[in-house]
Structure formats: structure tokens, C-alpha cells
Curated annotation (Swiss-Prot):
The keyword Cell membrane applies. This is Elongation factor 4. One of its GO terms (biological process) is positive regulation of translation. Keywords: Cell inner membrane, Cell membrane, GTP-binding, Hydrolase, Membrane, Nucleotide-binding, Protein biosynthesis. The lineage of its organism: Bacteria, Pseudomonadati, Pseudomonadota, Gammaproteobacteria, Thiotrichales. The gene is lepA. It is found in: Cell inner membrane. It is an enzyme of class 3 (hydrolase). Required for accurate and efficient protein synthesis under certain stress conditions. May act as a fidelity factor of the translation reaction, by catalyzing a one-codon backward translocation of tRNAs on improperly translocated ribosomes. Back-translocation proceeds from a post-translocation (POST) complex to a pre-translocation (PRE) complex, thus giving elongation factor G a second chance to translocate the tRNAs correctly. Binds to ribosomes in a GTP-dependent manner. SUPFAM superfamilies: EF-G C-terminal domain-like, P-loop containing nucleoside triphosphate hydrolases. Its EC number is 3.6.5.n1. Disulfide bonds: none annotated. One of its GO terms (molecular function) is GTP binding. GO terms for cellular component: plasma membrane. It comes from Francisella philomiragia subsp. philomiragia (strain ATCC 25017 / CCUG 19701 / FSC 153 / O#319-036). Gene3D superfamilies: 3.30.70.240, Elongation factor 4, C-terminal domain, Elongation Factor G (Translational Gtpase), domain 3, P-loop containing nucleotide triphosphate hydrolases, Translation factors.
Length: 594
């Protein structure tokens, strides 16, 4: 056991985490030359295209160190984006050390700081590594100072490397061997294994990635899942080298996979503990906290025949993604679908993209909302995660909205413009510090403002250099109202949203104008209105198409013309009473997309 090293890499998007892991695999001969490709561990297409890591992956490598001993390195790749921080905390629960990889040209970013604190809270040894030293703009000394000032860990002798060219990669491996502590645990104790991740394989059933804390798990043995109490028999155990490599057993301190023919998707929940059926341990491994979804949106299939497939797809994804929440929902405008909960907007986009790609579904997503708390006049408090659940304005005493504390790191030149957007988004400044060449700004912002488009705005005003990390801190009373859209007097549930009273008129007007462009003209007038409770705040009309009924008159008497026009008017009036407006799907899509 003293030769096992479990570690993961913490790094901001694009700081070279996946490339560095490729080099580790090459140095330790994990794959033959032929099988090496860029970003071996980013196995999903979306991960490659967007250049981000979404899922945690694990690799076991044998490294012959300079002292002549062979070490087993278990390396768990983690995502860098703020929406996937729960993936990070999960990976860290299985490790004893973490490499903090920082781009020597760019310096420290906000999300790296957040993930680094998670690692320190879990008592991991954090080792700073400066990457990309082959770049002409690299300033290792300045960045080392930044690491010390912002994060507060000693970076004086930080190992430098360039993952792209391969310089210094062996030094990094030596640093891991020297500084990461060996795992603790007893091979002969009762079995305790933590499930770090699970995914569904069409041939094998559920495949789980586990970290054995105590004891040994052999092929053919029976084990049980502690939360459900159900027992299974181990069909295969082994490690990823990154290919699946079968072994006879996994022992304390190791990280590997198990396949036990579990067909039920919820059979091995992530964060659960496995133990032997015949000799169980009494206490589970302390896992990690279950993440609460922060953003909710309705998802609907464009054709209703896809609904059963949609349900199955969500089931399979939720196995692989512990933080996805969903429940059935019915909308008059969009039919059957699910109300889904996500960690943030990127998470929502990724899930939608995975559903469309991996399961061939065509989806519409309603406008995202966060969870409000409505206090009714009779004292009851209800959680509101969709506009339709908001009680009537007369019944509400007050509405509380979630407030997040946002830490923003930006270069000095952009401070002014960042403060401006924070104020526009109803933010309250908490703190502002100059750290090295960067400025750390802390604001309390309403969560709905952060999840809608704050990140994009921040990136554009800081030319891509700003970075953001946020966490929910409290609920605060706010003047929120429900903005309804009425078409010919009928409410369209899919377009309702919860907005701040000050912005309601402006938002309503904008929405109505956009819909006017998108709804095709009918044979009768279509009135589009935005309303708050019983008050109409904006209105627009799609003019009717009319046939020229006088075309056949040629001169003729004025009373004849009047008669024809009156008759047409009557017809239009009757049509308006009984006619219903078909709203094309595109109209919903473009209004919801913004």
C-alpha cells in the first residue's frame, strides 16, 4: 500500500489538465502509440468539441520512479467548470492529494480557487504545478506569487512543466511520488468501498467506479449496497489503464471498476458504500454532500411520441450525473415533459445537448428559473420552482429570492465595467481587493441574474479574462412578480416567467414585441398582451389579413360597398370569438432562447 498514490488534478478550463494527463499515460505506457489520441480521457464528443471536461474519469498507471521502485498511480480526472463542482468534490473524496495546475501565462482563476478550497477542506495535500512554460508569455515567478497571495499555499519551489512539449512531466510524476501521502486503510478489515461514479453500459449493465477504503473485493464475491440493502455478485473487477483491464481483486487504497450485472439504473447510487454481504461493515464511508439543483427548466419533446424515450434517456443520464433532478410536468402549450433541475446554465446546455445527441431527441426548453420561497398570508411557506406554482398575488405576503455570493477575478483594466454590470444586475458590493495583477471583486447578486446571462456578459466586457465562482448564501425578500403572456386573452403557460417588479414592464414590452414578429398573421386580429396579475403592462397587435371584398364592385353605389365591408367585419368578429391561434414552435424556441 505504501506504493499507491491517489491524486486528481484541479485546474481552470484550458489550463492544460487533459493534455497533462495524456502525457502521464504516455510516460507510463498506459496505451500503445497507435491508441494515443488528444485528450484520451475526455471520452464524450461534447467534451472534445467544447474543450472542457464534464465527467470525472479514472486511470491506473504503473510508474517506475527514479528510486527504482514501481508506484501505482491512480489518477482521477476532474472537470474545471463551476457548474460541475460536485463532480470535483466527488473525485476528491477518493484521493489523498491534488495537483493544482495553473497556466504560467494566465495566472490563477476564480474556479480554481473554489475547487482548491474544496480540496483543502477535505484535508488533501495540494501541490502547485506551473504548466505551459514553453509559451513566450509565461511568467512562472509572477504566477507563483499569485498562487501564494490568492490561495495561500506555498509555491516557492513549484514544479514547472509543459504538457504540450513534454518538458518536466517526469518531474511532476516524481513530485507526486514524493509529496502525495500513501492511502490509509486495512486490507484485512471489513470491506468499505465508496462509489465515485456510475454509468450505464448496454452490454454490462451498471459499471461503477469505486475507491476501496478498507478490505478487499474479489471477483465472484457477493456485496451489498448499503443504502438499499440489495446484494449483487461481482462479475468483473479491474482498473482503467485507460482501457478496461480485468484483475482478480481490488484491495484497500485502490481505485477501480466493478461490474455486477446490475440492470436497475438506481441500483448503485453515486456516493454510496459497498460492503460484503456475509460480513458487512456497520458504518458507511462518509461520502460527499448531495447537491441541490439551483436552476429549473421545463423540457418537452417536440413530438409527443418521443415521451417514453425521453423518460428512459433521463433515467440513464441521472445515473451518470448525480445532480440531475427531474419530475413529470404538463404544459398546455407544449404537452408532456419534465421539470428538470440543474446546477447552472452550462450544466443545462450540456444535458440538453447530450439528450439530443446520444438519444436522438428533439427538445424544447422553457425559460430557466431559480427556486423562490413564497410566504403566504396564512404564514405557510412554499418553494416555487416554476412560474405556475406561484400563488395569486393577493395570497402572497412576500417572496424571497436566492442571493449568491459571487467572487469575480479580473485584470485591473476591467474593474469599472465589471462593477457596472454587477450594479445593473441588482448587486451589492461586499469586497474589492487588488491581488498581484488581478482584482478580486466580491458581490452579492440575485441568483436569477447570475444564471440567466451574467457569465456571458462578464466574459464579453472583460475580453474573456474575467472568471466567476458563486455559491448560494441566503434568501432575501424581493419584489418579484409573475409576468404572464396572453394571446387573445388566453394565458400561455410556457411563456410565463418570474421577474423583478422594476424590470417587469420593460421585459413585458420586449417579449410582446418579439412575439409580434414571430406569430404569423391570421384571418383575424391577434392581441398579444403581457400582464402582472390583472394589470396589462404591454400590448401589441398582429394585424389581420383581409381580402379585398370591393374588388368586384367597379364604381357602384356606396351603400353596396358599405354592406360588403360590414359583412366582412361581422365575419372577422365571429372568427375572432371562435378562432384559436396556432403558435409555431419556432416562436417558442426563439423567445425562450432569448
Amino acid at each position: 500500500m505504501k506504493n499507491i498514490r491517489n491524486f486528481s488534478i484541479i485546474a481552470h478550463i484550458d489550463h492544460g489538465k487533459s493534455t497533462l494527463s495524456d502525457r502521464f499515460i504516455q510516460v507510463c505506457n498506459g496505451l500503445s502509440e497507435r491508441e494515443m489520441k488528444e485528450q484520451v480521457l475526455d471520452s464524450m464528443d461534447i467534451e472534445r468539441e467544447r474543450g472542457i471536461t464534464i465527467k470525472a474519469q479514472s486511470v491506473t498507471l504503473d510508474y517506475v520512479a527514479r528510486d527504482g521502485q514501481t508506484y501505482q498511480l491512480n489518477f482521477i480526472d476532474t472537470p474545471g467548470h463551476v457548474d460541475f463542482s460536485y463532480e470535483v468534490s466527488r473525485s476528491l473524496a477518493a484521493c489523498e492529494g491534488a495537483l493544482l495546475v495553473v497556466d504560467a501565462a494566465q495566472g490563477v482563476e476564480a474556479q480554481t480557487v473554489a475547487n482548491c478550497y474544496t480540496a483543502i477542506e477535505q484535508n488533501l495535500e495540494v501541490i502547485p504545478i506551473l504548466n505551459k512554460i514553453d509559451l513566450p508569455s509565461a511568467e512562472p515567478d509572477r504566477v507563483a506569487e499569485e498562487i501564494e497571495e490568492i490561495i495561500g499555499i506555498d509555491a516557492t519551489g513549484a514544479t514547472t512543466c509543459s504538457a504540450k512539449t513534454g518538458i518536466g512531466v517526469e518531474d511532476v510524476l516524481e513530485t507526486i511520488v514524493a509529496k502525495v501521502p500513501a492511502p490509509e486503510g486495512d486490507v484485512n478489515a471489513k470491506l468499505q468501498a465508496l462509489i465515485i461514479d456510475s454509468w450505464f453500459d448496454n452490454y454490462l449493465g451498471v459499471v461503477s467506479l469505486v475507491r476501496i477504503k478498507n478490505g478487499t473485493l474479489k471477483k465472484g464475491e457477493k456485496f451489498k449496497v448499503m443504502s438499499t440493502g440489495v446484494s449483487y455478485q461481482v462479475d468483473r473487477v479491474g482498473v482503467f489503464t485507460p482501457k478496461m483491464k480485468d484483475l482478480d481483486h481490488l484491495k484497500a487504497g485502490e481505485v477501480g471498476f466493478i461490474v455486477a450485472g446490475i440492470k436497475d439504473i438506481h441500483g448503485a447510487p453515486v456516493g454510496d458504500t459497498l460492503t460484503h454481504t456475509h460480513n458487512p461493515t456497520d458504518k458507511p464511508v462518509p461520502g460527499f454532500k448531495k447537491v441541490q439543483p439551483q436552476v429549473y427548466a421545463g423540457m418537452f419533446t417536440i413530438s409527443s411520441d418521443d415521451y417514453p424515450d425521453f423518460r428512459e434517456a433521463l433515467d440513464k443520464l441521472s445515473l451518470n450525473d448525480a445532480s440531475l433532478f427531474f419530475e413529470p410536468e404538463v404544459s398546455q402549450a407544449l404537452g408532456f415533459g419534465f421539470r428538470c433541475g440543474f446546477l447552472g446554465m452550462l450544466h443545462m446546455e450540456i444535458i440538453q445537448e447530450r439528450l439530443e445527441r446520444e438519444y436522438n431527441l428533439d427538445l424544447i426548453t422553457s425559460a430557466p428559473t431559480v427556486v423562490y420561497k413564497a410566504v403566504k398570508k396564512d404564514g405557510e411557506t412554499i418553494d416555487v420552482d416554476s412560474p405556475s406554482k406561484l400563488p395569486e398575488p393577493g395570497a402572497i405576503a412576500e417572496i424571497h429570492e436566492p442571493i449568491v455570493r459571487a467572487n469575480i477575478l479580473v485584470p485591473k483594466d476591467y474593474v469599472g465595467s465589471v462593477i457596472t454590470i454587477c450594479v445593473e444586475k441588482r448587486g451589492v458590493q461586499v469586497d474589492l481587493n487588488y491581488v498581484g495583477s488581478q482584482v478580486s471583486i466580491t458581490y452579492d447578486l440575485p441568483m436569477i441574474e447570475v444564471v440567466s446571462d451574467f457569465f456571458d456578459t462578464l466574459k464579453s466586457v472583460t475580453k474573456g479574462y474575467g472568471s466567476l465562482d458563486y455559491e448560494l448564501i441566503r434568501y432575501e425578500a424581493a419584489d418579484m412578480v409573475r409576468l404572464d403572456v396572453l394571446i387573445n386573452g388566453d394565458k400561455v403557460d410556457a411563456l410565463a416567467s418570474i421577474v423583478h417588479k422594476d424590470q417587469a414592464k420593460y421585459k413585458g414590452r420586449e417579449l410582446v414585441e418579439r412575439l409580434k414578429e414571430l406569430i404569423p398573421r391570421q384571418m383575424f386580429e391577434v392581441a398579444i398582451q403581457a400582464a402582472i396579475g390583472g394589470t396589462i403592462v404591454a400590448r401589441s397587435t398582429v394585424k389581420a389579413l383581409r381580402k379585398n371584398v370591393l374588388a368586384k364592385c367597379y364604381g357602384g353605389d356606396v351603400s353596396r360597398k358599405k354592406k360588403l365591408l360590414e359583412k366582412q367585419k361581422e365575419g372577422k368578429k365571429r372568427m375572432k370569438n371562435i378562432g384559436s391561434v396556432e403558435i409555431p414552435q419556432e416562436a417558442f424556441l426563439s423567445v425562450l432562447k432569448k
